[in-house]
């Protein structure tokens, strides 16, 4: 299946990153190379881009798409949580901009055999990096009922989490749960008929939760944000695109902590903790897709862009 990728919030992201000729940029989730190609165009003639992705298919597609840019591009197969290690290994110095486009690509959803989609019957996998040992099948067949319920509740924000976990454990006693189709039917049976008619596909939240757990997406995001800030030069920018509230909450809270790290009691007239701001927001509010973009690319509807600029040591956030 050909890898297709429509970059969301493309112009808004380029503005947030303030891409300039000759700059050095890191695309932490290079995917099909849509954002990366635009960064390379805007940073011509000698701007450099390092593209990371843990999905070998995505990296192959990015390599094909970005081939015309020659040695201005370096692609590395790794999770973006290792961005600082990659920068060190490549002797990169400081980057002018870092982009993180979080979540599963359109291609991964559409590629049935990976197990991300509840619309295709496929082996229960859900790994973005297929060298990792934990699969969705391992999770649903081997984890304790309470832990499965916690994952579905916390990562899927699913109110029927306990009931779904109970039905999963009951079903696996009869035979192993090996396909997405089996799991979808179990979820449908667990959710009362009246509730199944609300809020889209009944398996959506559970599939999201299991995918997040299998790939440790939220932990990787927290580590990746810290690594991205570390590799930026003062004045460099970090732009992050998220697609659901759990990810956006982590980004929002992290950016707020960087802007106001002071831990002094609020009634203290002068800061004595010595924790200076690390970054400040590029825009006052998060950026979302326009009506025209949503019409052209419905998956952009849930996208949220936040960006910060790294401050000089001791510089005050505005």
Curated annotation (Swiss-Prot):
Single annotated GO MF: rRNA (cytosine-N4-)-methyltransferase activity
GO biological process, one term: rRNA base methylation
Gene3D superfamilies: Putative methyltransferase TM0872, insert domain, Vaccinia Virus protein VP39
Database matches in SUPFAM superfamilies: Putative methyltransferase TM0872, insert domain, S-adenosyl-L-methionine-dependent methyltransferases
CC annotations in GO: cytoplasm
InterPro entries for the chain: RsmH (IPR002903), SAM-dep_MeTrfase_MraW_recog (IPR023397), SAM-dependent_MTases_sf (IPR029063)
Sequence positions that bind S-adenosyl-L-methionine: 33-35, 53, 80, 101, 108
Name this polypeptide is given: Ribosomal RNA small subunit methyltransferase H
Organism: Symbiobacterium thermophilum (strain DSM 24528 / JCM 14929 / IAM 14863 / T)
